[in-house]
Amino acid sequence: GLYGAVFAQEAKKAGKTCLVIDKRGHIAGNIYTEEVEGIQVHRYGAHIFHTSSKAVWQYVNQFAEFNRYTNSPVANYHGEIYNLPFNMNTFNKMWGVVTPAEAKAKIEEQKREAGITDPKNLEEQAISLVGTDIYEKLIKGYTGKQWGRPCTELPAFIIKRLPVRFTYDNNYFNALYQ
């Protein structure tokens, strides 16, 4: 993958002999792309490079030309479009709230109504992070399908990496370079 490629490049630069072995029939791991009808297609799903380090950005640009891309996905729930990651645009569409304080109050209210004080599973953790409404519409079905089991059977830590922002920024990553 990317780590192995960087390691091999740096070792070679330092005068070492390198042999890159990959268990797949190609190098690059999960970031591997192949050309299909003139288009670079990610074989293993999109992987978006992002960093806030100017040094890292300059380093990787020695080897490839990058296209500027801002990942700002949306979710379609029965014809209703919601911004991801969950942010003030999502909260405004869901509840009509305008300020971060209003959104936080709504989430706290739904968390309290659900009786959650110490989240024990993914469902409880998700409700603690974004409220019952967003959990029911945008997390429950998708996550259950993704993992092949109900959210109540999944550990809470899985959802903790989910970005939740109390700004109107639809950018999935906070990184300067994408």
Give the residues covered by each predicted segment.
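N-terminal Rossmann-fold NAD(P) dinucleotide-binding loop
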Residues: G4-A5
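Active-site/ligand-binding neighborhood in enzyme catalytic cores
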Residues: H78-Y82, N89-Q178
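Short glycine-/small-residue-rich flexible loop motifs, especially phosphate/cofactor-binding loops
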Residues: A8, W57-Q58, E124
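Dinucleotide-binding Rossmann-like beta1-alpha1 core, especially the glycine-rich loop
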Residues: E37-E113
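Glycine-rich FAD pyrophosphate-binding loop
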Residues: E10-E37
